[in-house]
Amino acid sequence: LCIVVLAAACASPDDGPDTRSARNAVQTAEFRRQGSDAGSFDPNWWAAFNDPVLSALVTQAQQANLDVRIAATRVLQARAGSTAAASRLAPTLGLNGSASDQRSGLPDAYKRTSPDTRALRTSLDLGWEIDVFGAARASADAADFDAQASAEAAEGARLLASSEVARLYFAWQGARLRQQQFEELLQMRLDTERLIRSREAQGLASRFDVARAAAETQSLAAQLPPLRTLVATTGHQISLLLGRSATQPLPMLDERVAPRLPEVPALPPGQPAELLARRPDLRAAERQLAAEGARVREARADLLPRFFLAALFGAQDLTVNSQALSPVRYSNVALAFSMPLFNAGRLRAAEDRATARERGSAMQYERAVLGAVQEVEDSLVALAQKRKRALALDALQSQ
């Protein structure tokens, strides 16, 4: 047995999955920089737009969004699981007690062989699994990494809710602005049509001019219902993100207030590795990979012996035939071990499954990193082109 234990302890573990390609993707990424390279990420990024309505909507979404609240409950669940797994590292202590009163009902002459007894017993039980090969520690580490991944996922849910509220709010303001512009244009068309009809009555315009003016008015009026629908549906989507029913109006989205689009502040992206490190989904994937690695260590430790320490300390008060005896103290200390010898390959299959899950998690992490690089690059390119388009439109209007 000692030879088996020493050989198992000296065995070198597998180095785990190869994530060098994912790390290289972070290190070699060269994002196109827009503006300054400096600056750290502001968690209250929406405040840079200086829009109190947007700030109020984002704050409410972070508190009331259902996805955010669901993620928060998962964090509580994962933390409870982490606490439960860590408890395996500590000994257990229990208090036991019992009282018994046994009467035979026989005459006193026969009570020598069947005496009446009354007993009071109390004891302390101590149990501890000595974590020689780290199975309990690996289980606790896996649960702790799961809790960290849940916390990162919750942060990602808050970030997603905030960004979606901001995007929909800007879309709502833009739709209202286009609606206002079309309504002003429609009023101008109506005035023009009335003027042309008046000129026709005076013989200064033809029926063709009237028909053309009416067609232009109707064409412009036909574009208003889709814009009004867009304003309404966008407001409904914002209500849903805030955990409200679409039938409940949002006082903050007051259509009587003139629409406006805020100025887009400069958003310095920072360094590539810093940009990716800000993403909660990547941090969650990395923590999940660490959890799977801990489960591999746990599965390998299950192939090795397990050692247990048990102790019992107690006291007993005994009365026999109404005669009290002296209190008795007793104790029992035992050291035990168990080692799997044959289980039809169950433990080895569990190790293989954990190893495969770790490799799959490493691939998912690599895919998430590469996808994040693409998303950031695409966003920066789109931002640069939209700014160029806005400058070109401003130059065209100034001519």
Residue ranges of predicted features:
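Terminal intrinsically disordered/low-complexity segments used for targeting and assembly
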Residues: 2-63, 120, 144, 228-277, ...
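Small/polar-residue-enriched beta-strand and adjacent coil segments characteristic
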Residues: 44, 50-53, 57, 72, ...
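Amphipathic alpha-helical coiled-coil segments
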Residues: 70-85, 157, 161-193, 198, 220-228, ...
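Short terminal targeting/anchoring segments
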Residues: 206-208
